Every structure is written in structure tokens, then in C-alpha cells.
């Protein structure tokens, strides 16, 4: 199976990171590119996608997540999420004065979409990456 990280693919296609895409093209254009790339790639088989949290803002993407394969919501507390995000990169929606408040608001706005689009939920607050992978594999019986 091929692993596709949607954010990385959008960054590669534009030769800039998400922070710069947001600054130069805006969030709307990023969401448009993110959705178009995901929809196109989802036509193929035997793939594992890593998506950003905003993928659920597009109805077609939600339908694909729910109806074409098995989707996992990797859930974590806002403080844990912020620490994880800051370890890997700057993200425009949390590069603000009060990032915890921003994450909480994003969760409130998207929570229903996340639950509607997933088949399984894994609480990741206290899990290592290996433990999350083990849970994923157990749930898909690999």
C-alpha cells in the first residue's frame, strides 16, 4: 500500500510550505487544492492517506472518507495537539496569539464532521506512535 500525506503533496506541488501557501494564496485556495488532490488520489486503490483536519470541510471529501475505505479519527487533547504540531512545523491556524483557544474553536466547528466521517476513534493523548499504529492494525485486523 502507498502512503500519501495530503499536506506534503500540496506543499510539494506548490514548492512552499503550508504557512507560505496560506500567506500568499489564502486558506480558501489551500483548501481547494487539498480537496482536489485528495479527491483525485482517492480514485485509486490500496492507499493510506494522512490528511489535515480541514479535509472534512469539503462534503465530497467527507463522503470519500466515510464510504471508500476505513477512516480513523486520531483524537487528542488540544494541549497535546499543540505540542505535537509545534514539534513538526508551523501551522497557520495555530500560529496565533492564543493557539489553545484556536484549536478548541476549530474542534467545536468540526467535531460533528470528524465523527460523521470516521469509522474508528483512537484516543492518542497517552500513546506513542508505535502504540497508535498497533491500535490501527488491530482495528483493521492486520
Predicted segments with their positions:
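A conserved segment at the C-terminal end of the G1
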Residues: 1
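ATP-dependent small-molecule kinase phosphotransfer cores
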Residues: 5-54, 59-66, 91, 104
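NTP-dependent small-molecule kinase module
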Residues: 44, 109-142
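Short amphipathic alpha-helical segments
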Residues: 60-63, 85-87, 134-135
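A glycine- and Lys/Arg-enriched "phosphate-lid" helix/loop adjacent to the NTP-binding pocket
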Residues: 67-111
Amino acid at each position: 500500500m502507498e502512503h500519501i500525506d495530503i499536506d506534503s503533496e500540496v506543499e510539494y506541488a506548490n514548492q512552499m510550505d503550508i504557512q507560505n501557501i496560506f500567506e500568499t494564496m489564502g486558506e480558501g485556495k489551500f483548501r481547494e487544492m487539498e480537496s482536489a488532490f485528495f479527491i483525485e488520489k482517492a480514485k485509486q486503490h490500496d492507499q493510506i492517506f494522512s490528511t489535515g483536519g480541514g479535509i472534512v470541510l469539503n462534503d465530497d471529501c467527507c463522503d470519500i472518507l466515510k464510504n471508500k475505505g476505513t477512516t480513523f479519527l486520531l483524537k487528542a487533547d488540544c494541549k497535546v495537539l499543540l505540542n505535537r504540531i509545534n514539534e513538526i512545523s508551523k501551522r497557520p491556524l495555530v500560529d496565533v496569539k492564543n493557539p489553545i483557544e484556536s484549536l478548541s474553536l476549530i474542534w467545536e466547528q468540526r467535531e460533528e464532521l470528524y465523527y460523521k466521517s470516521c469509522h474508528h476513534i483512537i484516543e492518542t493523548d497517552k500513546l506513542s506512535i508505535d502504540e497508535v499504529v498497533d491500535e490501527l492494525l488491530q482495528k483493521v485486523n492486520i
